[in-house]
Amino acid sequence: MTETLSGVTVVTHPLVQHKLSYLRDRDTPTVHFRKLAGEVTLLLTYEATKDFPTEPAEVETPLERTEVQRIAGKKVAVCPVLRAGLGMLDGVLSLVSSARVGFIGLYRDEETLRPVEYYVKLPELGDGERDAIVLDPMLATGRSSAAAVAAVKEAGARSVTLVCLVAAPEGIDHLQGEHADVRIVTAAVDRGLDERGFIVPGLGDAGDRLYGTK
């Protein structure tokens, strides 16, 4: 079950919404938050990959030779935004185990709300034959996600999909303003941002809740 508006797909499946309710709950402990984040990401990945191109191949079943469909081109690249995006990585890899993995290190300056890049390590994308999934739990102001998408595009990805747990309208507008061709897949679009740039109602600081820091 999904709702799609202007390049944003909100996955409304009951399992996603049920698990999201516990991610939002401030009393959910770190160990459960971490597990739930991976499970929701797994379910979002199913939707995020639905338009990947396929090509025919042939295999031998125990009974006969038959034609099958396989994802076309090179293996997908999964690129979590450090550090919080790491909490989503296993959810994707549980479905797309052959994916290549890249890392984009960004943190948000809490005064300017602008992203600061400190590390980028991506798989080979320069041939334009590899689709990329960027993982960023919270699409808040959209600046960090936009910077991560820009890095992946610059490296040569064929297409880019952003998967996030929760998005704010402000973040969606900013990302689409800079990267109109990027599809966004999320479990929810929330009301907006508070004066500190946090999504409300949101689920708090995803990185802190994943790793038990403050």
What residues fall within each predicted segment?
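PRPP-associated nucleotide enzymes
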Residues: 1-214
